[in-house]
Amino acid sequence: MITIKKKEIVKLEAVLHLYQAVGWTNYTHQPEMLEQALSHSLVIYVALDGDAVVGLIRLVGDGFSSVFVQDLIVLPSYQRQGIGSSLMKEALEITKMLIKSSW
C-alpha cells in the first residue's frame, strides 16, 4: 500500500534514486545541488511503499503569494497507479493553506 507523507527533512540518499530512475541528470551529476535544493524547499511530500520512497513532489516559492511545483517524480515501475495524482492533491491542499493564511 502506498502512503503519502509530508517530510520536514529529506535526506539525499533517500531520493537520489528517483532522479536517477527518470534521467534527471542535472541533479544526479551534481548531488550536492540536489541536497541544497531539498533543504531550501517549502514543502516536500514523499510516496512510500513500506519504507521505500517511490515518489516525491517538491514545492518552492515564497510561501506567501507564489508556490510552484518544482519536482514531481514517480519511479517508472510505479507510474500509472495514481501516485503522481495523490502527490499533486496533497500539494494543492497545502498550497491552499499557505496562500489562504497569507491573505
Predicted features and spans:
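Short amphipathic alpha-helix that is part of the acyltransferase structural core
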Residues: 1-28
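A conserved beta-turn-beta hairpin within the catalytic core of GNAT-like acetyltransferases
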Residues: 61-69, 79
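Conserved GNAT acetyl-CoA-binding A-motif
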Residues: 88, 94-103
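Residue-level recognition of the GNAT/N-acetyltransferase active site
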Residues: 75
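Conserved acetyl-CoA pyrophosphate-binding loop and the N-cap/start of the following alpha-helix
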Residues: 78, 82-87
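Active-site rim helix/loop that mediates acceptor-substrate recognition in acyltransferases
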Residues: 24-44
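Conserved beta-hairpin
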Residues: 42-57
